[in-house]
A protein has these predicted regions:
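C-terminal output helix
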Residues: 85, 103-113
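Two-component/phosphorelay signaling modules centered on CheY-like receiver
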Residues: 8-27, 93
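Short amphipathic alpha-helix used as the core "switch/output" element in two-component signaling
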Residues: 60-72
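Acidic catalytic/metal-coordinating carboxylates
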Residues: 30, 58-61
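Alpha4 helix (beta4-alpha4-beta5 surface) of REC/receiver domains from two-component response regulators
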Residues: 61, 82-97
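Acidic, metal-coordinating helix/loop segments flanking the phosphotransfer/catalytic sites
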Residues: 27-47
Length: 120
């Protein structure tokens, strides 16, 4: 599992929560780091929890790259600025789900587990 978020506190909280739920988690603070992880076959995650707005990628380009290069990886897009158009665009590109920040811990861990189960 890969968590991609540029906000250190949010990223740390997500990593802690998902680790406590039994997931092995890698983290990336930006799109460039996420690309390296996804492209490395030894690290390729089954699920990516991806923040929509990153300093080096504020569109759906990273989502498209992940779906193209790792088609079996499920991507959950997180956003604090969601619109129906963004959700539709993300789902059209193959996002597993789009979730709005803030979210309930239980809901997110259940969604991650569901996404992970769909890869096996």
């Amino acid at each position: 599992m890969l968590v991609v978020d540029d906000e250190p506190l949010i990223r740390w909280s997500l990593v802690e929560m998902l680790t406590a739920s039994g997931h092995t988690v890698t983290e990336a603070p930006d799109a460039a780091s996420a690309r390296r992880v996804v492209r490395d076959d030894s690290q390729r995650p089954d699920v990516v929890l991806l923040d929509y707005r990153l300093p080096d990628s504020n569109d759906l380009g990273l989502l498209a790259m992940i779906r193209r290069e790792a088609p079996d990886t499920q991507v959950i897009l997180m956003t604090a600025h969601g619109t129906p158009e963004l959700a539709r665009g993300a789902l059209d590109l193959g996002a597993y789900r789009v979730v709005s920040k803030p979210f309930e811990v239980h809901d997110l861990t259940a969604l991650v587990s569901e996404a992970y189960a769909s890869t096996h």
